[in-house]
């Protein structure tokens, strides 16, 4: 990795200050299913159970450019009957420069999805409202906790793989 430098006017050089820029945001995939309509739109005695899943993926595009995709899916059920299913993959192209290598994964898996989340949340709310239901306002997500859990799971997988390799 190269370090960009700039002159500060007295002949000495200084490192480029860290920067994170959003180059683009986009809907990669959006699906809304309302299989029981119009019966599913009738008033209910109780609130439906809602199951929400969240995932984050990041892939390099160029030296400092990354594609980060926040995937949200939500299913609402009344007993065993599905009321709706919404799935969204919302992406952003980020330019990341001047950060130490050890900060890159947390930046891509915590900060980038944190910037994308309000937009993805609004798209899901609009889709459920347009489907005839009250808007689904997803609670804020702790991306730092998700990242820590992901790293712990990868560490366990690596340990299991090492154990299996030494056993053979």
Curated annotation (Swiss-Prot):
It is found in: Cytoplasm. GO terms for molecular function: unfolded protein binding. InterPro entries: SecB (IPR003708), SecB-like_sf (IPR035958). Gene3D superfamilies: SecB-like (3.10.420.10). One of its GO terms (cellular component) is cytoplasm. GO terms for biological process: protein folding; protein tetramerization; protein transport. Signal peptide: none annotated. It holds the Pfam family SecB. The keyword Transmembrane helix does not apply. Its main location: cytoplasm. Keywords: Chaperone, Cytoplasm, Protein transport, Translocation, Transport. Homotetramer, a dimer of dimers. One homotetramer interacts with 1 SecA dimer. One of the proteins required for the normal export of preproteins out of the cell cytoplasm. It is a molecular chaperone that binds to a subset of precursor proteins, maintaining them in a translocation-competent state. It also specifically binds to its receptor SecA. HAMAP family: SecB. Belongs to the SecB family. This is Protein-export protein SecB.
């Amino acid at each position: 990795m190269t370090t960009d430098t700039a002159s500060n006017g007295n002949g000495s050089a200084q490192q480029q200050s860290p920067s994170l820029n959003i180059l683009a945001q986009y809907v990669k995939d959006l699906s809304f299913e309302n299989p029981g309509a119009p019966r599913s739109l009738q008033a209910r005695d109780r609130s439906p159970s809602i199951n929400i899943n969240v995932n984050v993926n990041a892939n390099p595009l160029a030296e400092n450019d990354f594609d980060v995709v926040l995937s949200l899916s939500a299913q609402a059920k009344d007993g065993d009957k599905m009321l709706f299913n919404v799935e969204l993959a919302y992406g952003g192209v980020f330019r990341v420069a001047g950060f130490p290598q050890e900060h890159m994964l947390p930046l891509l898996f915590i900060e980038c999805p944190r910037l994308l989340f309000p937009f993805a949340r609004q798209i899901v709310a609009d889709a459920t409202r347009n489907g005839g239901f009250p808007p689904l306002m997803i609670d804020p997500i702790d991306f730092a906790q998700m990242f820590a859990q992901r790293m712990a799971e990868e560490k366990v997988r690596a340990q299991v793989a090492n154990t299996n390799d030494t056993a053979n």
